[in-house]
Amino acid sequence: MGEIFIGIDLGGTFIKVGCFDSKLKLLAKISAPTKAEKQAKVIVENMAKASEQSVAKAGFSMDDVPAVGLGCPGPAKYSEGIIEAATNFPTLRNVPIRRMLSDRLSGKTIVFENDANVACFGEFVAGAGKGVEDMVFFTLGTGIGGGIINKGKLLAGAGDNAAELGHIIIYPDGRLCNCGQKGCAEAYASASNTAKRATEALQAGEKSSLKKVLDKNGQITCKDVYDHLKAGDKLAKKITDETAKALAILCINTLHATEPQRIVFAGGMI
C-alpha cells in the first residue's frame, strides 16, 4: 500500500496527530487530550495511542510508517531529543522525549523539532506561506509559538530555540508569564491567559454574563470569552480587545525586526 508518515503536534491542551502520504495528502487525523499535568510516560503513551489510532483510521498499519515527526514546545535540545523545560508542561523537565516515543513505537525514527517551527515550515511549503521567501508565523493556543522563514530557510538560532515569539516582552514589568518573565505577549494574548484575565476580572467583582459559566463549570475557557463577545458582553469585549492589542504590538515588533512578506496565524484560537 506504500509508505505513510505521522506528524504529531504536542500542545498544552491537545495532542493532534495527522497521517500523510508521500505527497503530503492528509489521510486521517486524531485529536486527544494531552493531560499536560501528568508524568512524561503518560504523555508519551497518549501520543503513541493517538498515532496508532490515526494510522488505523487511514487503513494502514504501523509497519507502513518509516518515520514520525514530533513537534514540541520549547525550550528544548532538539538535536538531542530532549525537552528541557516546556513552559506549559510542568512535568517535562530534561525529558528524553524522542527516545521515549521511539521506544514506545518499536524503534520508529522520530524527527524532533519545535512545534511552531514545523508548523511554520509546513505553511511555507504547502499552505498559507507558499509563494514567499520571507514570512513570520504565529501559533495561538494554550501558549504562543512562532517561526521565521528568512530567504527560504527556517531560522533555528545557535541553540535551536530561535523565534520564541510569544516570549517577547511587550509590557515591561507586566503580568507574570509561565516562563518566569514579566510582560510576555503570551501572558496576555494566549488562549489560556485570555481566559485567565476574564476569570480574574470576575473574581474582582466585574459584572458579566460569563459569571454564570464560571459558577456552573468552575472555570472559563477562551472560547467562552469569544462566545460571550458575540453576544455583546462588555467584559468579554474588554478582555478580547486587550488580547488583540497585545497581538498587534507583538506583530509590529516582529515586523520591524524581520521585514516579512507575509504574517501567518494558526492554532486553536484561529
Q: Would you name each region that the model predicts?
A:
Residues 88-91, 111-117, 137-140:
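Active-site nucleophile and cofactor-binding loops and adjacent substrate-binding regions
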Residues 30-32, 87, 158:
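Short hydrophobic alpha-helix segments
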Residues 1-67, 76-82, 99-109, 122-132, ...:
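ATP-binding/phosphotransfer module of carbohydrate and carboxylate kinases, centering on a glycine-rich
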Residues 149-150, 154-158:
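Catalytic-core segment of enzymes that process non-peptidic bonds
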Residues 138, 158-159:
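Short Gly/Pro-enriched turn/cap motifs at secondary-structure boundaries
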Residues 81-93:
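A charged helix-plus-loop insertion that forms the helical arch/lid used to bind
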Residues 161-164:
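Structural signature of FAD isoalloxazine-binding scaffolds in flavoprotein oxidoreductases
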Residues 9, 69-73, 113, 137-143, ...:
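Short beta-strand segments
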